């Protein structure tokens, strides 16, 4: 439903430059520019990581930082379809496969303020490309906490502790989960989410972050 609405309102526009295009959601020029960005890939994670693999698509800088901020805070939801397409190209490049996609949830307060969960939008468009089902309400935010962006690396670890919970754990037991987040800084949020998924029987968790800004952590 989300895809149909956005496609109807914003047909044939590149989510990066805004130019009209005939196919895809990213024009050839922008695609070539984005190919120069270096992704961060960990196929064997650190001992303190609860996820099994990590793929971060773009550094949190330049045009991608600008587009993510526009998507999150300027209500430019159509950018999510380009982000979904770019994510699909990267997971295809590394042959990453999963049984389900699960977006990192946000609090009810943040949902009220913004009106949507940006990671859920990205996951829904990614699902259109990779044909993997999204479990939108399987992982939930169980309590409100402070904004991660205002905290130090050590404070972030404490801030997200026990902030997430799994509903319907039978759906993820023995399954490989692709966990979708918008921005990873220290990895505290995505690691805590992965911990909960593993706690309730997920076989493997592949963490995917669209942008990364390393400030110490995993």
Name every feature range the model reports, one short phrase each.
Residues 1-181, 185-218:
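Glycine-rich phosphate/pyrophosphate-handling loop used in enzymes and phosphotransfer proteins
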